Amino acid sequence: MQHDTPAHETLWDLIKDIRFGMFTLRNAAGMLHAHPLTTQNQSVDEGATLYFFVPRDGEIVRAIAQDAQVSVSYADPGDDSYVSVSGEARVDENQAKKDELFSPMAKAWFPAGPTDPNLALLAVRLHHAEYWDVDDSKMVQLFKMAKAA
């Protein structure tokens, strides 16, 4: 990757073709638990937020209400692409954003469409992102955002 490319664009280049990310949270028992989720973004903007559709009545929504700190890992061994991001998750109630991101693939899980009452749009505001640089055999930090006090 070129060093003059903005970090959010580099991140998108690394994950855009990886169908599933492993979304990891701390469950009610305090254990780390991972779920395969499909990233709904069409790009990653400077705000560095990733979006996922999840069932409103499921474990993920309950868990992030208790602990919003999550991580998402992406891997494509065929492309030597390994990415880890972490941030704060929340349910985004923006119906226009749901409409924008809803796809035929999402309809398989939420047949009533983007207005399905059980459809929750999960927004993960990234605080940290890094990837494995295969050529140099090391982790490379894409960005680290300071948390607001």
Residue ranges of model-derived segments:
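General beta-strand recognition
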Residues: 22, 49-51, 130
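A generic structural signal for short beta-strands and their flanking turns/coil linkers
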Residues: 19, 35, 46-50, 66-70, ...
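A short, Trp-centered hydrophobic/proline-enriched beta-strand micro-motif
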Residues: 13-30, 70-74
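A positional/architectural concept
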Residues: 30-37
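N-terminal leader/targeting segments and the immediate start of mature chains
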Residues: 1-19
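Charged, amphipathic alpha-helical segments
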Residues: 4-8, 54-58, 106-107
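Charged, gly/pro-rich active-site loop segments
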Residues: 1-3, 85-149
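A short mixed-secondary-structure module that forms the rim of ligand-binding clefts
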Residues: 40-79
